[in-house]
Structures are given as structure tokens and as C-alpha cells.
From Swiss-Prot:
Name assigned to this protein: Alkyl/aryl-sulfatase BDS1
Species classification: Eukaryota, Fungi, Dikarya, Ascomycota, Saccharomycotina
Gene expressing this chain: BDS1
Cofactor: Zn(2+)
Organism (species): Saccharomyces cerevisiae (strain ATCC 204508 / S288c) (Baker's yeast)
A GO BP annotation: dodecyl sulfate metabolic process
Sites where the protein binds Zn(2+) 1: H162, H164, E273, E292
Amino acid sequence: MIGAFKRNRGSSQSFAKECQPSTLKANLEVAKELPFSDRRDFEDATQGYIGSLSDEQIIGPDGGVVWCMKSYGFLEPETPANTVNPSLWRQAQLNAIHGLFKITDNVYQVRGLDISNMTIIEGNTSLIIIDTLFTTETAQESLKLYYRHRPQKPVRTVIYTHSHSDHYGGVKGIVKEADVKSGEVQIIAPVGFMESVVAENILAGNAMHRRSQYQFGMLLSPSVKGHVDCGIGKAASHGTVTLIAPTIIIEEPVEERTIDGVDFVFQLAPGSEAPSEMLIYMPQQRVLNMAEDVTHHMHNLYALRGVEVRDGNQWAKYIDAARVAFGSKTDVLIAQHHWPTTGQMRINELLKKQRDMYKFIHDQTLRLLNQGYTSRDIAETLRMPSSLEQEWSTRGYYGTLSHNVKAVYQKYLGWYDANPANLNPLPPVAYAKKAVEYMGGADAVLARAYKDFQKGEFRWVASVVNQLVFADPNNHQARELCADALEQLGYQAEASTWRNAYLVGAMELRQGVPKRRSTGKRNNIAVLNNEMFFDFLAVRLNATKAEGKIIVSNWCFINSNERFVITLENCALTYIQGWQTDADATITLKRTTFEALLANEITMVDFLRSKEVEIEGNRLRIEELLKLFDDFDQSFPVVEPMGGST
């Protein structure tokens, strides 16, 4: 899942500093250790190229830039910049290759026009689209690019491989919702798709969107000192994210369907890269689509934006099941990120090494935690076997061995390391103030931290000086030194996600947090069923404001004729289907009107005055209830305490 935030271009590079000698040394060592002479990935990434956008950018209806690849022209030199890890530089170059590509007869991909790929299959009379990119603008332009080179068959089928927004967000750019409702267009998705969308993008959506700014570097300008890549793709487009609910659900572990003359075998892979995911084999074309379960890097078992931990053991089994079932019958392996792999020997080798990578991380973490090591101990000491470490396809550009180890630990043992000293620590600000006091005060800490910074001990400096920031966010020397340390860590990071997080943290320490209020997610809210809708509403209930209140109301939605009893009691909002005769009030409304209120498109006054809203009984109780819900702030602080600096 990726949040749709516009990059604040030009704001980060002007404050950025040069790399320190120790950073330069570390990056030069990387250049010596890895097989940079192996150019097969570049050959694969350019094979089948047909054409691309002439000006390398996509402009939205408001005139804003939605996507711009030419901003990454600085990646053209073979020699990496000193401020970028050479391994990440190579991945960034590969992800900069963009356009329409032929995979095999009747199968095409648009790559590099968003963070994900669009796969286009030509049926007898129509097109079948696998994944619709992140935004409507990039999806629309990708389809236009295809039509410039291929027959203009209509899109009649959309397939979502999984429940992350960069794979469904552009759907309204290529099909109309009315055509889906009429049955003219079908949308196919794996079982649990909508539930996963709600859980990841709605219930915890605001926090994930904010954290996504760090993971994907959405506030950074493209430059050698700023944004260079996202590992899984170049960058997330910043346009319009939409969603149309699927009309057909794949429910069986392996399910075969024929769509407009094209045979498909769907293999469910729940709990792998997403809670709801499936792999796709096309026997006529001998193409295996591994969705996002096999890509050209180490993926996340835990995403830094926040997500349910993924099961590395099960993930490995899904990969092997696909290898056994389809490996000997596949000539081209594709995914919904990155470039294809051709030839059975190479395909099977890729599948085996990806399988073994996730299996190794899972099993070795469990071996060591069973010996009593903590997650941080294991992450610090475990190393990949040399047979995998020298493979480009297992390098950590998105996930890392370090945070994937911690994910496995969390999955089995949770956050607590069993040391009672860590059972109930002080909260961050109180801890920071006490720690600074014990260390002799801010000046003493800064004096030692400056010396350690010169030695290249950036991890320690960032950690200890961030305590100064939390103890006193107005300590500008501490903010600057912490930013400097984070920046050097970013310059050294092989993982795009780590680089982005470090550099966004440095930027916000220097410039503050860009302020923006949530405008809601109308498109996502609109596709929720009523139960999901009330779950989302309950998450926004402010318990402090609700203290001591008991409100019972009937809700009747005109569009669906469904009725619910909503109860506020004990600072919890619950619901059941039905009707309560002695409720405080009854509200009859079109759900779209309430969606507009939750998305901040209309005010409370407008809502209550709307002709589409009727209230019987105690109107004041409905007003009282609606005032209890929070409007989430998309700009909450991350590298400084809540409240921030003044």
C-alpha cells in the first residue's frame, strides 16, 4: 500500500550536505564486493521494448505533474554518485527503464510509468488488464501508450493480483464503474481482497500514509542527495487513487478460468506479500506471473510503513508450489514490479533462490530466537549465505535482512524480549529527559556526539542525539546533528526504503513537518460495505470526548434499505443489523451524503441541513454523536515528539 502524497520538489536538496569520508569509504567497499560486471538484468529489462512517452512525464487534469521520469536523468552515468550506495544506484538505473514492452505474443507490459507494472493480455475480442497501477492518470496514459502501438480492443476484464493500492488505484482510469455495475466489465480478485483493503488502507490508513512518506521518500526531490528509487519501482505517482470492488472472487487454492479465449490458472497465496494475493499462470502463452511474490530483490516480511507481518515460511511454500506446478512449462516469468526473466533454467534458478531466501530468514531467525537471542541480536549477526549474497535478485533494496529478521521475531514472539527491564519502560519524552539528565545534560551529550560523528559512528549518534530532540525539540544543535547522522546513514543505505526514511527524517529535523490535513479517502470509503463502514467510523471515535455518554441510534440507508442500531457506550461504538424502538433518534439518509462528511467534502452543518438526511427523535443526540469523531492529521511528527518544536 502506498499513500498518494505529492513530492515537495526542491525542498530537500538545498539543505543536503556532502558525504563524510567514512560514507565514501563504505560505498567504495560495496563497489568492490558485488558482481557489477553481470549485465543480464539490463538485457532483460530492455528486451521487447516498443516505445514510451515522448516527454517522459504525465500531467494531471489540474496541470500538476503526476509522473516524471526525466527528473531521474542524473542516474545515467555508470559511476555512482558518492552519496548513493553503488548497489542501489544499479537498481535505480534498472527501475528507470520505462515504456511498453512485448513479453510474448498477445502479452505486453507497461513498466516504469508508475511504481508498479500494468500487464496487458490480448483476448479474442477484448483486453484483460492485470493490475491498474497506482493512479488513474498513469493508468490512462499507459493504456494510451499501448493503443498507439496495438489494436484498440476494449478493456472487458481487470484482474487485481493483490490488495495493495499500487495494483488497483488506477482502475477508474481504464474502466468506468457504471460498466462494471452493468456487467460489461468484470473485475477478478483473490479471496479476502476487500477485507484486506479495508484493514490496510482504511482502518490504519492515516498512520500508514504518513509512514509511507518515509518509506517511499515522497517528500524528497529526485537527486543524488535525495530520492533515487523505491527499490520495488522508481517512485509512486501522485495522482488520483480509486477503487472498484471486484465482481468475481477466486476462492479455490488453484482455480482455472478461460477469459475471452485466454486460459488462466490462479494460485492463491494469502499471507505472502499481501494478506490477499494470487499468482497467475497462462498456459497458452507459457507465462508465469508471480504478482509480487517473486521480484528482483529481497521483499518485505514487514514494511516500514506498517503492516501485518508476513509469513516467510508460507511465502517460500507458495513460490515452490508455483515452481513445481509451472516451472517446467514456463518460458517467461513476469511480475507486477520489475522486469521479466526468460528461459526455463534461469526461471527455475530465480524461483529456487527466492524460495530459499525467505525460508532461510524464517528458519534461521527461529533457530536463534530459540537459543535466547533477541530480535536486535539476530538482526545484527545473521548473514545471508554466500550463494545468495552475491545474487542481485536477493539484495535488500526494499526489504532488508535486518528488518525482516525482526519481522519473523515479531510474528512468533511479539514486541517483548522477555527482559522485565523492558516490560514497561517510560514513554519516549519522559525517557529522553531522564536519559539526558543521566548523561550530564545536553551540552555534554552534544560534545561527545560531535566526536563520534567525525569517527563515522552515525548509528549511535542518530540514536543518542534523537534523545536530545525528544527531551527538547527546540534544541537546534541537536536537531541538526541528528539530521546530519541520519543523512549519512541514508547515503550508505543499500535499501531504498532505509535511504528514504533516513533522508526524510533528516529533512523534517531541518525544516519541520509539512502541514496537511486529511481530506479523506472518498473513493476507498465508497466501496466499503456497511459493516466495514461502521468499523471505520468506530476507529475515529474520540474516547475522551465520549466519556460517560450513552447514545443509541437507528441508521437506515436509503440506497441499500439496510438498517443498523448504532450504540455508543463505555467509549466504544458498536453496531448490529436491526431496529431498536426506544432509540434516542433515527436517521434516514443516503450513504453517499455521510461519505462526503467523513471525507471532509461537506461540513457538519451542511450534512445536518441536507435534504438527503432525515432525523426523527432527539436530533441533538445525533449532533452530539457526530461531534465525537476525530479528523486525522496526516502530518503528525515522527522524528520529534507530539507537539513538536515552537
